[in-house]
Amino acid sequence: MAVLAVAGGLAVAVRAAAPASVAEEPLLSPALLQALIDMGQPGQVIVPPPGRYRGPLRVTKPIILDGQGKVTLDGDGTGSVLWVMTDGATVRNLRIVNSGDEHPEQDAGIQVRGHANVIEDNLIENTLFGFSLEKSDRNIIRRNRYFGQDLEMPRRGDGIKVWYSNDNEISDNEFNNGRDVVFWYASGNKFLRNVERGGRYGLHVMKSSENLAEGNLFYDNMTGISLMYDHGDVIRNNYIVRSTGTVGVCLSLKESSDVVVENNDLMYCASGIAMDVSPYEPGTKNHIRGNRIAYNNVGVSFVNDWKDSIFTGNLFTGNITEVAVYGGGSAMRNTWDGNRWDDYQGFDRAGDGIGDTPHRVYGYAGQVWMDVPNTRFFKGAPLLEVLDFLDRLAPFSEPTLLLEDKRPRLGNDKSFKAGSTLEPKS
């Protein structure tokens, strides 16, 4: 396979020189690099001489552009840095820096407008958007690292935006201090083994279907994963912690149907799972199973009295409130079966790992914050806690049965497993 580089204005075979430090990187001619790319034949490997090149640059043929870790593409604060406008190209081992900051133009490190491209092992720094895919299918975006511009959250760009693009694989990437990772009108995409830190939405999927998010780590985002107006997504084996925004949700489902949420860790958030009119489509169900929902303010919250979600085999532990239903009503129109509850007060005389009596969660007077939004600020206040205690001790009104799990699992059941298999990272 031919390997080409620019030397003295000509395309010749070369051996790459040792990389210079960032401060010493020579500024080389972008016109010569663009000419080299344009001269390339399908399948050729283009290895530019080490150094720094001003963007924007365009890949319009199915070549392999390999910076070998020694090439920087610098947008100099204007526009997008690299455009991939073909099918079947590979872009790897580049450092891409300093895009513009214009949201109407979606200034990005790499813009993709084609199919079946591979974007791998690149470092993207100080760009508004990391990647932007529009009407581009079957691309692979893997092992890249993105560090967004130092801006206030609303002004940041997305680590990756996938718009009207299907069947892409986004795997083993690291997204730092962007705004969102977002899928719009996108189906059949896979988001695998990525790390997302310090953003607004770790993963935001809207008006899409049959996407898979598996094996990802989400830290310190304002919301972990949010599905809105979706159908058929699978959220599996993810580790979502410390969502610190105004809502502070590990996982939210809004008007989303036929969703599978399984074997995730959902911890240290205001709400582990927030359900908002989900499932939405008649005749559909959402399956929430095998998750560890732990150390949240509320384990599962419902915006209203909704139905047709099935909760099985989940571990609820360390949550201040297990389940909350706002605006009145209960969660009884959903199925609760075989979950483990750390405050279950029954026994297991048969020794089969299943409680002898159902686990029931009631709403007492002290939980007025569920019904009256303006009182939520006072949740946990001594007055409400005393009121709740007195109502439990001597009920002066009929408490609301929020849920009933007829087969609660107990701690002596060694076969019970919940949560992800991931090893947390700092």
Where are these regions (language model features)?
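Acidic Gly/Asp/Thr-rich repetitive segments characteristic of extracellular carbohydrate-active
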Residues: 20-58
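Bacterial N-terminal signal peptides
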Residues: 2-11
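Functionally critical loop-and-helix segments that line ligand-binding/catalytic clefts
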Residues: 246, 250, 273-281, 287, ...
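Extracellular beta-strand solenoid repeats
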Residues: 47, 58, 66, 74, ...
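Detector for repetitive beta-architecture
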Residues: 43-45, 50, 56, 62, ...
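Extracellular beta-strand/beta-solenoid scaffold signature
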Residues: 75-83, 103-111, 126-129, 133, ...
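Extracellular beta-strand-rich solenoid/capping regions of secreted or surface-exposed proteins
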Residues: 38-39, 53-64, 73-117, 129-135, ...
